[in-house]
Amino acid sequence: MKKESPLYRHIRLPMKILLIFFMSITVIGFTYKYFDTTDETRMKMTQLERSLQDLKAAMSIDSVRNFHISKIMSIIDVYNNELPPVAKYEIANEIYLASIKYSNLDVDLICATITHESAGTWSPSIKSHAGAIGLMQIMPATGVYLAEFEDISWTSENEILTDPIYNIRMGTRYLSMLVSYYGVDGGLAAYNGGERQASLWIKANKADGILWAETENYVPAILKLWDKYKAQNL
């Protein structure tokens, strides 16, 4: 049996909701036209109206989701237009799910972090000279630790950390934890340069000369990208 493409489901779901919505409207109109408004009929009408309200809410939620996924895919295209459409969709969907799971991360901040961490490549297989791997540049030792929280069976650093879905799950969990401890600026500093330096920096009211030179450039670079993506519309 042929497996359905997730990209196809992305398009098909709103169509299903719309079809149900218009069918429900037809049923309501038919009921009003051909039946007396007895108590039983009014009760059924009320139930139908509630169902319609639920459908409208579902359509609204799905519309927001589709907007964010389309936006993320357009960002990916800027940096890596050779990534297959299904892979782009799956990455975008995982980023959106992470933004729902972690209230202190939004889609734009996650995308900004990935853009900078991957050196503007959005390549799932990218590796740094220091040994960090994947979209969110996770060190293998950190990956082993985070994999336990995500119920990911660790096989090898290459297999797990170059998997973009696993990488995003682990990276966003780690970033969210750091942001909850140190705020956005401090969380980004800790993600890049370690918690000790970030903690000292926050305690010193973000004074110059405490963070590593790389981290001093890293934090404002991601904040700039974050602002750019927040202002970006399709």
Feature locations, PLM:
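Catalytic glycan-binding domains that act on GlcNAc-containing polysaccharides
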Residues: 55-234
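N-terminal secretory targeting signals
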Residues: 1-89, 227-234
